[in-house]
Amino acid sequence: MITTINNKHKKLNVPNLRFPEFQEEWEESSIGEMFDLYSGNTPSRLNKSHFKGNVNWISSGELKQHYIYSSKEQISEEAAQSLKMLPVGTFVIAIYGLEAEGVRGTGSITKEPSTISQACMAFTSKGKVENEFLYSWYKKHGNVIGIKYAQGTKQQNLSYDILEKFKIAYPNAKEQGKLNKFISLLDERIATQNKII
């Protein structure tokens, strides 16, 4: 059960809708304080063997679902050596081409060890905040962030320097866990309904 909190007379750093067993005020920190951020790269396409392998190489157009299991293009182990190998559970967002509505604000969580292109930014938690919580936060705010803060003339992009400064309010680990399970369940039901439709 989720209850509505009346914050009219008391300014708290908490959401209006909340599980009733949690009463503590949420803390706030910047993304850079809570996550390590990594951008990717593209192995040279002049060497055709680079794209003949089984290592995930995620591009910005693939971040439409909650979880990403396999990328459209796979690279070789040799090509992957020059890139950052991201662990399972890494949150990845699109940072290039944000003038396009279908790309702006998109992000997914990896279900396999993966590498990424330079059009993506990856986030791994330092411990305070789970990647699943960041996914939920970005799902709510990512589109507005792209519209307001992306830079560039023809192509609108976000950068490390922009993203690391954003402040996030977050609950304790127990409340994060319950919220993450609840949101994952909602996403699963939405995905099931979309398949039926």
Predicted ranges, named:
Residues M1-E24, T192-I197:
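Short amphipathic coiled-coil heptad-repeat segments
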Residues K11, P113-M121, Q151-K174:
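A short glycine-rich beta-alpha junction/loop motif
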Residues N16-T42, Q65, K165:
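Non-catalytic DNA-recognition/assembly elements of restriction-modification systems
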Residues G32-L46, S59-T90:
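Sequence-specific dsDNA recognition surfaces
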Residues A100-S108:
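Short, Lys/Arg- and Gly-enriched loop/turn segments at beta-strand edges
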Residues N180-S184, K195:
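Acidic/polar-enriched heptad-repeat coiled-coil alpha-helices
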